Amino acid sequence: MAHENVWFSHPRRFGKGSRQCRVCSSHTGLIRKYDLNICRQCFRERASDIGFNKYR
């Protein structure tokens, strides 16, 4: 097998590798609540556009 064929040849169905941010395709810091699937960095940038308000 060539080097390019080895990495990520196994299908990712569950776990952190299977999910990514719908904005920037990052795998880290993912917010899955309410089926957002956005990383926390992108959420902070777009929270008011989505409709989340900060009360405090």
From Swiss-Prot:
UniProt key word Thylakoid: no
Record-linked PANTHER family: 40S RIBOSOMAL PROTEIN S29
Keywords associated with the record: Metal-binding, Ribonucleoprotein, Ribosomal protein, Zinc
Cofactor field: Zn(2+)
Descriptive protein name: Small ribosomal subunit protein uS14
BP GO annotations: cytoplasmic translation
Pfam families per the UniProt record, alphabetical: Ribosomal_S14
PROSITE patterns the record matches: RIBOSOMAL_S14 (PS00527)
Annotated Zn(2+) binding sites: C21, C24, C39, C42
Lineage of the species this protein comes from: Eukaryota, Fungi, Dikarya, Ascomycota, Saccharomycotina
Family: Belongs to the universal ribosomal protein uS14 family.
Disulfide-bond pairs as recorded: none
Organism expressing this protein natively: Candida glabrata (strain ATCC 2001 / BCRC 20586 / JCM 3761 / NBRC 0622 / NRRL Y-65 / CBS 138)
